[in-house]
Amino acid sequence: MSRIAEHLVRIGPRFLPFADAASDQLPLRKLLRLSLFQVAVGMAIVLLVGTLNRVMIVELKVPASVVGIMISLPLLFAPFRALIGFKSDTHVSALGWRRVPWIYRGTLALWGGFAIMPFALIVLGGQGYAEGQPFWLGVSSAALAFLMVGGGVHTIQTVGLALATDLAPREDQPKVVGLMYVVLLISMIFASIGFGWLLDPYYDAQLIKVISGVAVAVFFLNMIALWKMEPRNRAFTVKPEKEPEFGDHWREFISRENALHGLIVIGLGTLGFGMADVILEPYGGEVLSMTVAETTRLTATFAGGGLVGFWLASWVLGRGFDPLRMAFLGAAAGLPGFFAIMGATEMTNVWVFLLGTLVVGFGGGLFSHGTLTATMRLAPKEQVGLALGAWGAVQATAAGVAIAGAGVLRDILQAMPDLSGYGPGAPYVAVFALEAGFLFLTMIVILPLLRSALAARRL
């Protein structure tokens, strides 16, 4: 381990956020090495949602509706996250592993998707050497690449978090999962800055180098994270007499009090925070005339706000604060952020736009940690992996709907002649206003849960 890492380990829980997630069973240095799988996932998310979103729309001139659909394709696997987690719970392996084989499969899918993606995007854009190539070829190859990346990301993250909870003591599992998401946000910040620097100025050959480099980095990061991490167990080599049924476990989980209501809250809140993902960077480039590097840093700004929100939520929740109330406050914090983003259109002020983006990210961090903690507390010990999968499935599915819907809605509004007189920012403002509406609806839906929780504490 490097001197810097050793110094961080010695700092201790008092100053290092989430250091109290470590234990004798899972030391901090081992926990940080395991979290490298989230670094790989963060790089992939930034590349898809941030960098390639801007490059496809502005540089490659791909319609925003096509971009929105492409970016949402990886999220087709989102509804299966609970099933993926359940399958890794019950996997039978000759080597005595349950998690490692699934993470390895996800890594290969992610690597393969990135291997063909840059060439597919260049053909999709139809410029330069790809001019005159059939449109269907670019669409089909790009769709395949995005699907492979999506399958890899969801598999790696779901099973990786399950492995982290396996290794951590029961009482430390929410802290460990919180640390994993903080690492994800930090990696997104640095990845967005790095990709912006590498792609400024943009040219096709550099795009190929960057995406291919990410493919190689993802493979090695996951191999380092998994090295001697999961202990081998002879019991995992024996096939049970009766195969466990996913449907039975799912019905048991969803029948718990407020489980379905809580998943609805997660979906609505994610719609509120998620639609901005696909239009923040095009909005900055088209309306506020920001460069590729400047708009790519928007992802870092958004993730930075989320990092602060996630850390604050973890600190407060660790002192007994109600996670549902935390989710309510997160949705409430997102409203002024979207108002600032919408106001930046009239003021043509980049700093107001950045401030609004930061506040929206902060609210998203509070909301995500609140709903994640509430979901984990809802599940018994033997269903924590299923609970994580359910949270991830609803969150990622809603994010996919939000991303696709925002791109299509932006294109429809942009094509309406009645809005042409309001300037190029009008379609974006309409989408941001819709997001604010979803957050307000989320707050309304959370209120009955808060009242029932308050009544239960009074008994």
Curated annotation (Swiss-Prot):
InterPro entries: MFS_trans_sf (IPR036259), PucC (IPR026036), PucC-rel (IPR004896). It is a multi-pass membrane protein. It is found in: Cell membrane. Keywords: Antenna complex, Cell membrane, Membrane, Transmembrane, Transmembrane helix. Gene3D superfamilies: MFS general substrate transporter like domains. Pfam families: PUCC. SUPFAM superfamilies: MFS general substrate transporter. Belongs to the PucC family. PucC is required for high-level transcription of the puc operon. This is Protein PucC. It comes from Cereibacter sphaeroides (strain ATCC 17023 / DSM 158 / JCM 6121 / CCUG 31486 / LMG 2827 / NBRC 12203 / NCIMB 8253 / ATH 2.4.1.). The lineage of its organism: Bacteria, Pseudomonadati, Pseudomonadota, Alphaproteobacteria, Rhodobacterales.
